[in-house]
Amino acid sequence: MSKFEDIRGVAFDLDGTLVDSAPGLAAAVDMALYALELPVAGEERVITWIGNGADVLMERALTWARQERATLRKTMGKPPVDDDIPAEEQVRILRKLFDRYYGEVAEEGTFLFPHVADTLGALQAKGLPLGLVTNKPTPFVAPLLEALDIAKYFSVVIGGDDVQNKKPHPDPLLLVAERMGIAPQQMLFVGDSRNDIQAAKAAGCPSVGLTYGYNYGEAIDLSQPDVIYQSINDLLPALGLPHSENQESKND
């Protein structure tokens, strides 16, 4: 008996689950920091900040950059900088800069993970409604899905500005299930991070945790999803479909 035999719809996280968005996000973060004459962070560090939406990303970036600047100045024997702008205002300015730069680099800095398009196509062909739940600012979501040619697979898309409470709160998942016309326990949620699994548990949805993606350096099994997969196309046999062996290039 399949663990997911009662599933009537599937919803996915975006960043770290369907797409590798770290190159574009990191580039935009670093350009915003540079514009404020702050140290740049680099992709490896920015990856550990992804997952809670753009505002939290800016807070994490600014906190790190200010600390890094203080450390560098101390190492060079220079006095600390007294910021004229309060941290809250600096976060707001950083967010405006980030939005501008991310709009310029999002498409060229985002790539589908292997097997994503094949898996979405197979699930759609089976007749399962598919949803997307992301904390990414809503204005960036639709253009990105279109550019990657996966918008056609989703009947429901919820961005970070479409609900008052983002993941790990259950509200976005409950809204997707409602729009699909199914109960939360009939909707499988697939994600790569602690926030995704916590949201699924809170909403009463069964969950799949993927081992790749962005999870603050934690192993996904620590969040105790119902099932853990190494590849997104491992979903297919679990939902009664053949396992796709088609290879997709990250740069396709």
UniProtKB/Swiss-Prot annotation:
This protein's record includes keyword Endoplasmic reticulum: no
EC number per UniProt: 3.1.3.18
GO MF term list: metal ion binding; phosphoglycolate phosphatase activity
Cofactor: Mg(2+); chloride
CDD domains on file: HAD_PGPase
Catalytic reaction(s) noted: 2-phosphoglycolate + H2O = glycolate + phosphate
Metabolic or biological pathway: Organic acid metabolism; glycolate biosynthesis; glycolate from 2-phosphoglycolate: step 1/1
GO BP annotations, alphabetical order: carbohydrate metabolic process; DNA repair; glycolate biosynthetic process
Highest taxon above the source species: Bacteria
TM spans (from-to): none
Keyword Iron tagged: no
Gene3D superfamilies: HAD superfamily/HAD-like, Putative phosphatase, domain 2
UniProtKB keywords: Carbohydrate metabolism, Chloride, Hydrolase, Magnesium, Metal-binding
Active-site residues (renumbered): D13 (nucleophile)
InterPro entries the record matches: HAD-like_hydrolase_sf, HAD-like_sf, HAD-SF_hydro_IA, HAD_sf, PGP-like_dom2, PGPase_prok
UniProt xrefs under Pfam families: Hydrolase
Protein name in UniProt: Phosphoglycolate phosphatase
Name of the gene: gph
